[in-house]
């Protein structure tokens, strides 16, 4: 249920996946290298240096703006945002202020009431990332901090939403949709550490706004906001004011902690960046080509592959999953569409999440082979899950992944036929072991049938066809349990 008193707006900082920094030629591939090895006089802000704008970063930002239905401003400009912090080597950040690259726009999500709704955007602007502090100990009690400027100058876009979200869950849905769109555009790599950071502004209607910083995960946004809603409501119930402030989210503890009083824009003393000309991009707009985006792909999955809307939404929510699905059903496996959608969205996704594996660890052709023998009736669904788990565990251990057919043969998982004497014997044995179930059946309790079917499935390790097994159990019960 939507909590009408909750008002949430997000400021989402996304690193653009360019090869070089925003204002210099330093590489952005810094994560596996030593500290301060991807720096130069420009990104360190040394005297006498001049920034040179990365055109590819602007093109990526414009592509995002177009995909999010924004109006691209014909002329924007960069400004200096002045504040002192150790990770800001120049003591100012080059960003955009009153003349951003794009304005307006929206992101469509499924609201908490199940209806599609538009989350309006305020603006999208381009800026440089600051460096990174490494606290020796922890941020509160460490003896000192180290500064790594490898990240300084990485191109960022900041996507600012209107305060249109009405729950922490809607905020997470907004972020998931935004992430999917950026991945489809090919401008963002969500798997890179620190590639997305969120500042969340939250208030309860009629009370002061609180900004929560230091949120670096999609789940973290929902958890941080849920904690903050509870904290603010508790203050109000006790008759205490909600103070306007900035709080940090401590992910390990799942709480927010007061950091400082919230700054106003005047505190940053913005003024135009004198070393960069105004940015005129009107002639570039016509060259922006968009790929198929998540909403369009979702609709295509419904019409082309007859996926349910829920399955299509899950499959297209991540670019890799959507590509995997189409890889599975390509060629002569078009008849597997419905089965593939169900197994990927419901079964495979859960097994991967349990093992903390990505879908790119799974070979679509091999997974398609598993679905093919399921569809042929060679194995039961329960045995299919067992085969899948063996395949994933082998992959996780770095072992050679067997084919589904080989696993079925090795573990003797082929479905037991209804005319197989072993199955009839298993039914007879289970019935003889459970006389109370026979009494319950005779008393009109049909739940006894399901119980006996389950016991036979255990005895046959899930190899019996449930429908055929149900028929055999009922026949045996009608025959007096013989």
UniProtKB/Swiss-Prot annotation:
The EC number(s) this enzyme carries: 6.3.5.-
Enzyme class: ligase
Superkingdom of origin: Archaea
Keywords: ATP-binding, Ligase, Nucleotide-binding, Protein biosynthesis
Matches recorded under InterPro entries: Asn/Gln-tRNA_amidoTrfase_suB/E, Asn/Gln-tRNA_Trfase_suB/E_cat, Asn/Gln_amidotransferase, Asn/Gln_tRNA_amidoTrase-B-like, GatB, GatB_C_1, GatB_Yqey_C_2, Gln-tRNA_amidoTrfase_suB_CS
Single GO term (MF): asparaginyl-tRNA synthase (glutamine-hydrolyzing) activity
Entries under SUPFAM superfamilies matching the protein: GatB/YqeY motif (SSF89095), Glutamine synthetase/guanido kinase (SSF55931)
A Pfam family hit: GatB_N
NCBIfam families referenced in this protein's UniProt entry, alphabetically: gatB, PRK05477.1-2, PRK05477.1-4
Known function: Allows the formation of correctly charged Asn-tRNA(Asn) or Gln-tRNA(Gln) through the transamidation of misacylated Asp-tRNA(Asn) or Glu-tRNA(Gln) in organisms which lack either or both of asparaginyl-tRNA or glutaminyl-tRNA synthetases. The reaction takes place in the presence of glutamine and ATP through an activated phospho-Asp-tRNA(Asn) or phospho-Glu-tRNA(Gln).
Subunit structure and binding partners: Heterotrimer of A, B and C subunits.
Name recorded for this polypeptide: Aspartyl/glutamyl-tRNA(Asn/Gln) amidotransferase subunit B
Organism, scientific name: Methanoregula boonei (strain DSM 21154 / JCM 14090 / 6A8)
Lineage: Archaea, Methanobacteriati, Methanobacteriota, Stenosarchaea group, Methanomicrobia
